[in-house]
Amino acid sequence: MKKYFLLMTAIILFSSCNAQQKKVNATIIDGNLVGIANKEMLQQAPFNAWYDLFYKDYQVDETVISQLKPHMKGVKIKLFIGTWCGDSKVATPHFYKIMEAVQFDEKNIELITVDRKKSTPENDQQGFDIQRVPTIIFFRNNKEIGRFVEYPRETMEADFLKIVSGQPYKHSYQE
C-alpha cells in the first residue's frame, strides 16, 4: 500500500510539472530535430556531440553578463535553430550558457527547430519571417524588441545587451 501511495504521488507530481511546460512536439526527420523542442533534447544523442562540445568551450563575458542580467526581466525569447546548420550548432549552446549566466528562466524560452526550408510540420515558424538560422527573437509585453540573426555583430552577449536595453542594434543582415 505504501509503495502504491508513493507511486501515485510521483505520477501526480510528474504530471503537474509536465502540464506547466510548453508543448514539445519535435521529432527527428531525416536525422534532424524538427518542431518545438527543449534544451534537454539537444543534450541527448546524436545532438549532444556538438552541443556539449560548444557549450563546454564557451566562456561568457562576465562584464557584459552583469550589464545584461537586469535588462532580461519581462523578456520572452523564441529561438529558431536548425540541427543541420553549423551556425546553429555553435550558437545554440552559447545562447544557453549565456541564459544560465544571467539566470534567465527557461520557461520564457521557446526552442523551435526547423528543417532546411526553415519550417516545421506544425508551421511554428509562421509569422516570424525566418530566413536564416539561428534566429533569436526577443519580446517584451508580447512585442518583438529585436532579433539576433545567424552570427553576432560584436559578441552574443553584447548583441543581446543592445537588443534588450533598447540601444540601437541591427542584426547581421540589416543595413
Which residues does each predicted region cover?
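Loop/turn elements at helix/coil->beta-strand transitions in domains of secreted/extracellular proteins
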Residues: 73-76, 107, 141
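Short Fe-S-cluster ligation motifs
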Residues: 117-131
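Bacterial Sec-dependent N-terminal signal peptides
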Residues: 1-24
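Thiol-based oxidoreductase modules, predominantly thioredoxin-like and allied folds used
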Residues: 78-83, 106-120
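Non-globular targeting/processing and membrane-anchoring segments
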Residues: 17-62, 66-71, 159-175
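Acidic/His-rich structured neighborhood in mature extracellular/periplasmic domains
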Residues: 111, 131-132
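Non-catalytic, surface beta->alpha helical segment in thiol-disulfide oxidoreductase systems
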Residues: 132, 137-174
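Local sequence-structure signature of Cys/Sec-based thiol-disulfide redox active-site neighborhoods
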Residues: 70-101
